[in-house]
Amino acid sequence: MKKQNNLRSLAAQAVEQVVEQGQSLSNVLPPLQQKVADKDKALLQELCFGVLRTLSQLEWLINKLMSRPMTGKQRTVHYLIMVGFYQLLYTRVPPHAALAETVEGAVSIKRPQLKGLINGVLRQFQRQQETLLNEFATSDARFLHPGWLVKRLQNAYPTQWQRIIEANNQRPPMWLRVNRTHHTRDGWLGLLEDAGMKGYPHPDYPDAVRLETPAPVHALPGFAEGWVTVQDASAQGCAVFLAPQNGEHILDLCAAPGGKTTHILEVAPEADVVAVDIDEQRLSRVYDNLKRLGMKATVKQGDGRYPAQWCGEQQFDRILLDAPCSATGVIRRHPDIKWLRRDRDIAELAQLQAEILDAVWPRLKPGGTLVYATCSVLPEENRDQIKTFLQRTPDAALSETGTPDQPGQQNLPGGEEGDGFFYAKLIKK
């Protein structure tokens, strides 16, 4: 297959599909990666992630340097210019190469007549860069987040919102989960050191290791054999709070892509686990993860609001509900989230979460444990959600995580720590 090698035009098309069409980067990027040589895949990914991370700034610069926006069939050029700005600001690509390749990208998207315009805007930016960046530093766009999300974070975290925003704008660390059925964490860290890499254990999550420097999975000792899995430290907290035991009947609801399903089975290899997700396509990832780790679980497609459709009258000893959410705790890992979410989505998600909680609670045995988890930092989906659930559910009691007035444990994203995550552990009386 002929490889299309103008990365800049491909990156522009990817960002356009995210911002204009509401597609997630995880769906858009893989087919575009197939169009470039292996050596260029990392740069294409960097351009896509980087432009989405700094989109507010790049948009602000375009508005300063162009008298009117590019619209209609020329819209891709708008994003191509952003790709040019991003290279000049944030990459080690030599400026002359960044300019030449970005201008040439106009040919790939069949807009050769706009090469002069692109060249002119990028050169004007180079001339005015210092003045423009000084002005940008005092603008509302400097937070690199949509205004509605900044307001929500300010309201929820009056003293911490800037730290959360700064964390969201950083590159994420790479966390791994050591498969305790194969090695102790210390034992695997020794293998990692033998392979010339360094890792650090997490103080609270017993299987979690942070790599000093992110590495491709094929370089990790025993990855193909299932000795280790890529999973953020905070996501590993779910199994810690769930505390699964061998012989128990356990439901992992909203299970795709299967990271938590397999963690449950590493902690309790003889548990009977049912993994359910509404998205048939994403369930293929659950099967892949189970296969790589040599594990078995019952995998079903189903809507969490209607458990009778996928589990009949079954009841479970433990339930993990990793609820659908705004994903505002994992923005540093998925910067497209900032531009895919809308303010109105939060109330809709909170309503969906409440419906799933109410539907699945009767499926928990008396004395059983339900862990409600999200990768959100917004109280409407987390603390407020559990507070109102406890008020309307007399046989539910909070355990280990917070108080009835301030229920749950909220992890915030930050530095080398895990992602933003919320957990509430509930016991059925």
From Swiss-Prot:
Keywords: Cytoplasm, Methyltransferase, RNA-binding, rRNA processing, S-adenosyl-L-methionine, Transferase. Pfam families: Methyltr_RsmB-F, NusB, RsmF-B_ferredox. Its main location: cytoplasm. The active site is at C375 (nucleophile). One of its GO terms (cellular component) is cytosol. Its EC number is 2.1.1.176. Residues 397-419 are annotated as: Disordered. GO terms for biological process: regulation of DNA-templated transcription; rRNA base methylation. It is found in: Cytoplasm. Residues 400-412 have a biased composition (Polar residues). The keyword Cytoplasm applies. It catalyses: cytidine(967) in 16S rRNA + S-adenosyl-L-methionine = 5-methylcytidine(967) in 16S rRNA + S-adenosyl-L-homocysteine + H(+). S-adenosyl-L-methionine binds at C254, A255, A256, P257, G258, G259, K260, D277, D303, D322. One of its GO terms (molecular function) is rRNA (cytosine-C5-)-methyltransferase activity. The keyword Lipid metabolism does not apply. It is an enzyme of class 2 (transferase). InterPro entries: MeTrfase_RsmB-F_NOP2_cat, MeTrfase_RsmB-F_NOP2_dom, NusB-like_sf, NusB_RsmB_TIM44, RCMT, rRNA_ssu_MeTfrase_B, rRNA_ssu_MeTfrase_B_ent, RsmB-like_ferredoxin. Specifically methylates the cytosine at position 967 (m5C967) of 16S rRNA. Belongs to the class I-like SAM-binding methyltransferase superfamily. RsmB/NOP family. This is Ribosomal RNA small subunit methyltransferase B. It comes from Salmonella paratyphi B (strain ATCC BAA-1250 / SPB7).
